[in-house]
């Protein structure tokens, strides 16, 4: 399927963009963060990682700024009962790193902020993905989160 698009941003609405690739406009559903990034690049070259959804009467493209967002989206839709629109909604509530940490720590309440995700669905997501995202919060932290965590541990160890 279509795994990546590079072209010119032709149009941006509240939930999707149209990327012109060689004279063909591709409608791509995106997260709010991706939308903000792309709007800043109006009429400039843009690149998106994509996930293609094909059903009986639907062919949808979902676009992401980076491979990490795409992989997390694909993890979410691997959970029975979680479709691409719900997964996109989950990605809208927090950065991927925070969502991974919440799932690894078993915090289902973080996911219930999404319309259509109740406590049962959130618990199911946590149950099915906890091992896939690391199982423990400190195993999946990276970048700034890891540095903050290490700094706090160091201060606590010194009695602060």
How does the language model describe each region?
Residues 124-160:
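Strongly charged, low-complexity linkers/loops
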